[in-house]
Amino acid sequence: MDSLVSTRWLADQLGADDLVVLDATMHLPDNPRDAAAEYAAAHVPGARWLDLASFVDTGSPVPKAVPTAEQFADRLGHLGITPESRVVLYDDSQIKSAARAWFVFRLYGFAKVAILNGGLAKWKAEGRALEAGQTPVTPSEFPLPTRRPGTRSKADILANCDQRAEQVVDARDAARF
């Protein structure tokens, strides 16, 4: 599955048994918009609400830390996703939050995941169908994944500060750094 799919591709695929569409919209805390209310008011037909703001490691002292493998598997199970599912993520956010969701899926080895090119804004601009309310979900059992090689924990990063064995790049903008 390509990492980026078009609105036309998604429109043609809607209704496929193995396709799960997730609204991954999230706004920064200083933004007054309510992503959950926006989803409830208008979303791609059949899309489920990911709630990316809570798709984090709830036990970590680090804000917005990547969810644990257990939390990842639990959330995917609640969303009715199986290892055979194809997942398309989209957002309607200035921070392009679908990209964070895509990263988390890929981090845990979920390969059949893509981002909708242009997000909900493009979908709406093309006059495509929208739905309101919550999409009913039949939960599934999602197996516990493992993290992909190449990821580092906070402890790994702190140890590297002394060892300087690896180059670390912080991609946040200056205001968040």
Question: Which residues does each predicted region cover?
Answer:
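Cytosolic catalytic domains that perform sulfur/thiol-centered chemistry
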Residues: 1-177
